[in-house]
Amino acid sequence: MMQILLLALAVSLACADSIDYSKVPGNWRTIAIAADHVEKIEVNGELRAYFRQVDCTEGCDKISITFYTNTDGVCTEHTVVGARNGENDVYTVDYAGENTFQILCNSDDAFVIGSVNTDQNGQTTKEVAIAAKRNFLTPEQEQKFQKAVQNAGIPLENIRYVIETDTCPD
């Protein structure tokens, strides 16, 4: 929990915007992901998630994310529901271990999400992703994403543009 709060604090410096939760629900595509353990987001990696749908319920006390993973060309659909824990807008969910996540900044057509995954072996992975309502980012969105990645302590060379390999169904 402390790691996601530190990640959120660092990344919030890149995303000075406040979160408008009315803009969270909708159809989204993961454009890019960065992680400190980059193998987790490579092709076939368990944290390489292709977002499709995000919904808010109970005043956004719960966020539902529908996404695909692609292992050896086989797309598998997943839906996870994150429950807000506390006042810091941090959500917890079980997927490939224990996860905490937070929407760090958003607009009408893009959002940046930060997460910390602790897998079954106890390995902790910091991750920052950006999703959009189209298949590309504006230069400003790209800049905010890269700044968030740097502020999370993740090298820019660990960014993977996953939209290029998204062959899963809409």
Swiss-Prot record:
Subcellular location: Secreted
Residues making up the signal peptide according to the UniProt record: 1-16
GO terms of molecular function: odorant binding; small molecule binding
Disulfide-bonded cysteines: 56-60, 75-168
Tissue: Expressed in harderian gland (at protein level). Expressed in hair (at protein level). Expressed in submaxillary gland and harderian gland.
SUPFAM superfamilies: Lipocalins
A cellular component annotation (GO) from this entry: extracellular space
Keywords: Allergen, Disulfide bond, Secreted, Signal
InterPro entries with a match to the protein in the record: Calycin, Lipocalin, Lipocln_cytosolic_FA-bd_dom, OBP-like
Post-translational modification: Not N-linked glycosylated.
PANTHER family, per the entry: LIPOCALIN, ODORANT-BINDING PROTEIN 1A-RELATED
Annotated family: Belongs to the calycin superfamily. Lipocalin family.
Listed name of the protein: Lipocalin Cav p 2.0101
Organism: Cavia porcellus (Guinea pig)
Gene that encodes it: Lcncavp2
